[in-house]
């Protein structure tokens, strides 16, 4: 079934994600703060461009956001030109951003009060996963809403799972980022050790990647790390932002980490 879809936020993740929804045959209207990105998108994919989040959301069956942080999400959602001003009753709002569980629960309640539904649905897989349409999506919200939205989420993902009630998607993403950060740090230390010990890193990685040390980061990042090339994948500043969310959530929940 063809649906009217709004997609707000055309960064390195959102741009191809919106593209996959368009290629699946849905009617997509995009908004991005930097207008040139939206103009580029409509030149590449079938769809329309809006001047505000509210304009993009007007008449949409499904509204997607993929923005940088809590403040950005509040602005495009609840701001003067935010999507809450025009979102129709019965629509589903799916947020793919990595933000706090607190703001997700706030938007869930605000959406209910307005007569529509909200899912927190952060993503994992990086730019390559977005461009390949093979992202992993961890979802928090109501089961009925999830079942309604899943066919559209499937357009850009290979694995979608409802974890639990509102906020559960973001809490799961926090765990995901903790695991990745620890793995990257360990891999970095190991590579530094191996290089300074005079080892052939190709032989080392070919060997240990077949054992218990194997990880996605080892398979996909060891060579660029060995070559001191770091303009790949997920930016350090974004990881720091995500880990700050983890620390704040742990404090609020009295969890020792």
Predicted stretch roles:
Residues 53-116:
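Rossmann-fold NAD(P) dinucleotide-binding segment
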Residues 1-65, 91, 96-97, 127:
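NAD(P)+-binding Rossmann beta1-loop-alpha1 motif at the extreme N-terminus of oxidoreductases
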Residues 161-165, 169-219, 223-253:
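Active-site-lining helix/loop region of Rossmann-like oxidoreductase modules
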Residues 28, 49, 117-119, 160, ...:
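Hydrophobic beta-strand scaffold residues
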Residues 67, 99-177:
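Rossmann-fold dinucleotide-binding core
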Residues 255-257:
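Conserved small/polar residues in nucleotide/adenosyl-binding loops
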């Amino acid at each position: 079934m063809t649906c009217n879809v709004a997609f707000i936020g055309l960064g390195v993740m959102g741009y191809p994600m919106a593209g996959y929804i368009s290629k699946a045959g849905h009617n997509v209207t995009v908004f991005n703060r930097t207008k040139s990105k939206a103009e580029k998108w409509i030149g590449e994919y079938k769809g329309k461009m809006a001047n505000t989040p509210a304009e993009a959301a007007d008449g949409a069956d499904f509204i997607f956001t993929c923005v940088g942080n809590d403040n950005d999400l509040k602005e495009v959602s609840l701001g003067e030109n935010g999507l809450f001003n025009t979102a129709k009753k019965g629509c589903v709002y799916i947020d793919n951003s990595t933000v706090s569980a607190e703001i997700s629960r706030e938007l869930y309640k605000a959406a209910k009060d307005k007569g529509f539904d909200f899912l927190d649905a952060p993503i994992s897989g990086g730019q390559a996963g977005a461009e390949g349409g093979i992202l992993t999506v961890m979802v928090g919200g109501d089961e009925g809403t999830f079942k309604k939205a899943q066919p559209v989420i499937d357009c850009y993902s290979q694995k979608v799972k409802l974890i639990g009630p509102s906020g559960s998607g973001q809490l799961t993403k926090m765990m995901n980022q903790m695991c990745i950060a620890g793995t990257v740090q360990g891999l970095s230390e190991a590579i530094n050790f191996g290089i300074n010990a005079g080892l052939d890193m190709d032989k080392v990685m070919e060997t240990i990647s077949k054992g218990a040390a194997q990880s996605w980061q080892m398979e996909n990042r060891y060579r660029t790390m060995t070559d001191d090339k770091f303009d790949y994948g997920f930016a350090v500043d974004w990881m720091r932002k995500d880990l700050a969310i983890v620390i704040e959530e742990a404090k609020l929940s009295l969890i020792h980490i």
